[in-house]
């Protein structure tokens, strides 16, 4: 169903598995989001359908996101799980700079040019109830901008797309092997970093730390 309806950028597929469960009751399929929030350092960008509509330099991106989220008010419905849309995405490790003042001015090398935070505003989604074998089609609208008829038309369109036949065409396999990947840090440097972190923990300088390396490969 995901491949049929949402196999595109700024969509998602989530399961509601909790704890040690092997099977989750709900599956969530987020259809393509029109609005996307991206944060680079202290710059917040809001895109709508790929077009930049807002751009701000802020002191605290986390506070800005919280204020943005607070403008939405969604009623709780008994037949739906607690999650039925909203902000979906990721917060990168680099956001520690927003929380720990001592790290605020550290200059980092951005080799990948990816957002520190990326959040989709998920208005349209499917909730699959694996227990009752039902699919809930959800769309959120702003009553000041949209009408009930507009939302109903969108729901009917999604339902029609669900009923359409779909033939999956497998993607060609990438010609990349494990040995093709090259570390930007190197094994020896990585091992030395792990040993340094162990000493810092024993000395009480840090409680935990995360070391990582970028792996690169050229697709053939």
Give the residues covered by each predicted segment.
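Extended alpha-helical targeting/anchoring segments
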Residues: 1-216
